[in-house]
Amino acid sequence: MSSKTLAKFLEENLEDLKSKGLYNVIDPLESSNGPIITIGGKEYINLSSNNYLGLATDSRLQEAAIGAIHKYGVGAGAVRTINGTLDLHIKLEETIAKFKHTEAAIAYQSGFNCNMAAISAVMDKNDAILSDELNHASIIDGSRLSKAKIIVYKHSDMEDLRQKAIAAKESGLYNKLMVITDGVFSMDGDVAKLPEIVEIAEELDLMTYVDDAHGSGVLGKGAGTVKHFGLSDKVDFQIGTLSKAIGVIGGYVAGKQNLIDWLKVRSRPFLFSTAVTPADAAACMRSIEILMESTELHDRLWENGRYLKQGLKELGFNIGESETPITPCIIGDEVLTQEFSKRLNEEGVYAKSIVFPTVAKGTGRVRNMPTAAHTKEMLDEAIRKYEKVGKEMGII
């Protein structure tokens, strides 16, 4: 007999979400996640993917994955610390370290796992974390898991960070202090003020932790936000995902050799989860090699990002202050935003709405993610549909 308490909880809360329009319906794809996708037998121009460089469908990665399956099988067979570490994992980590300009790196099964692993391996209840108010959910959860005191500072407000860091330092309550920020903030596409953050950190002896999920492959000629600012030797923790620009799955922490050595013996997702599959490891390594060999995909991504931004801006849409190819189209009202996204969908443009509580009330937006794989013809068609729907709904 199943729990009546659970049944009541689920029924009431699911109904509440649905009545408020906050229940997320998942659309399964019947195609690869490229610039054109198929859902329910209909083709859409895809502006919702994190596949920034189009590498998720690249034949070179497919060949690497197939080769690894033939050699190693489909699974690693154990956790890394028993006998699940393949020579392929070591090569991947060496490639990541070279890519990120650090001494060493450690690979995890997901980007989310990285933040659950690294923060709690170093911070505890006697420490404090200074965290940007718009940091990713995995940073928030990883910080909570560590049991450290979490001190939130206003988004990219360096004076607020400085004052709160000074207060934490002078209180004498904490053994260690860490400042954590996203490299690129995914909702607005703005970039963290890393030079100022590093300056404050050096002044007050804060550990520096940058989650570059949306910066790797995009900034710094592909090497990420830290490299973009020339701070590779100044940031203690460089976190990244292998599922966005890299196009596969997994995540990593890059930094000093002694940090990586510590994470290998103290980060629980590394110790208690089976290793990344051979196919994924091989595909990730090939993807990073492609990025280090050429900036062609990186340059095309930025060209397409500028093209879409210009087209939407000229139509009169509010695209915010994005500093990256991420292009939010800010509508404001939550209901209007969701209806706008629905109408775009009907016109063959797949661009999902993002509303409260993911973003602040009154700042609902449709977030567009142009990729290196989009053609100008695809973007022109999307811009035409934006114009049609925007005028029909009185948004422009």
Curated annotation (Swiss-Prot):
Known EC number(s)?
2.3.1.-
* Record-listed pyridoxal 5'-phosphate binding positions: 111-112, 186, 211-214, 241-244
Any one Gene Ontology BP term = biosynthetic process
Query: Could you tell me which InterPro entries the record lists for this protein?
Result: Aminotrans_II_pyridoxalP_BS (IPR001917), Aminotransferase_I/II_large (IPR004839), AON_synthase_class-II (IPR050087), AONS_Archaea/Firmicutes (IPR010962), PyrdxlP-dep_Trfase (IPR015424), PyrdxlP-dep_Trfase_major (IPR015421), PyrdxlP-dep_Trfase_small (IPR015422)
Q: Which cofactors, if any, are listed as required?
A: pyridoxal 5'-phosphate
Q: Which residues cross the membrane?
A: none
The similarity comment for this entry is:
Belongs to the class-II pyridoxal-phosphate-dependent aminotransferase family.
Annotated protein name in UniProt: Putative pyridoxal phosphate-dependent acyltransferase
Q: What is the lineage of its organism?
A: Bacteria, Bacillati, Bacillota, Bacilli, Bacillales
